[in-house]
Design a protein with these regions (language model features):
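FAD-site-proximal beta/loop scaffold in flavoenzymes
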Residues: 9-74, 80, 84
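Glycine-rich beta-alpha junction loops
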Residues: 13-21, 99, 105-109
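FAD-binding beta-loop-beta segment adjacent to the flavin cofactor pocket
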Residues: 36-54, 105-126
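Short, electropositive alpha-helical surface patch
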Residues: 70-79, 108-116
Length: 171
């Protein structure tokens, strides 16, 4: 029942992304907000109505990029907050909206765009090493050679040292 529309545009480079939506079983559940996403506090990632539910990744309503880089930063926030909740404490970690998108501008050079809520730049590296606003060969090498083993051998096994969450700063 989806309306199909054909759009023709001329371009030099195009990046096409399918619409990002939560699955039907989430959209129709009491967990969802009016737009169909799991309705969480965007800092703690705790559900706004069901305090025993936490959410991360592509199904929750934080206005960030739905990327693996975002989920990588969200997972430790949820983990620390669930442990605090089990101990009867308030949430101790917060998510800053981090997302990352390596933008290929030519073979051998990318812009390693890293950003948080409101488009705030959140670089992982000093600007003199990798400037996230400019294409570089070093960023390409990072994406090509270093990030795959970090992803497969560390991140997916819960041993990724660069994903430490921020502490809650206040309400």
């Amino acid at each position: 029942d989806t309306k199909v529309e054909r759009v023709e545009k001329s371009f030099d480079m195009i990046h096409v992304c399918p619409p990002q939506v939560a699955p039907d079983f989430i959209r129709v559940s009491p967990l969802a907000d009016a737009a169909g996403w799991v309705d969480v506090d965007q800092a703690t990632l705790r559900h706004k109505s069901f305090t025993n539910i936490w959410s991360l990744g592509d199904v929750m309503n934080a206005p960030n990029a739905k990327t693996a880089a975002a989920a990588r930063k969200q997972a430790p926030v949820v983990a620390e907050n669930v442990v605090a909740d089990i101990d009867g404490k308030s949430p101790v970690a917060q998510y800053d909206g981090y997302g990352s998108c390596p933008l290929t501008v030519e073979r051998g050079r990318i812009v390693l765009a890293e950003f948080g809520y409101g488009g705030t730049l959140l670089p992982s590296f000093p600007k003199w090493l990798i400037d996230g606003t400019k294409p570089s060969h070093l960023a390409w090498l990072l994406k090509e050679k270093l990030l795959p083993p970090i992803y497969w051998k560390a991140m997916l096994r819960g041993k990724e040292w660069l994903a430490k969450p921020e502490k809650v700063t206040g309400a």
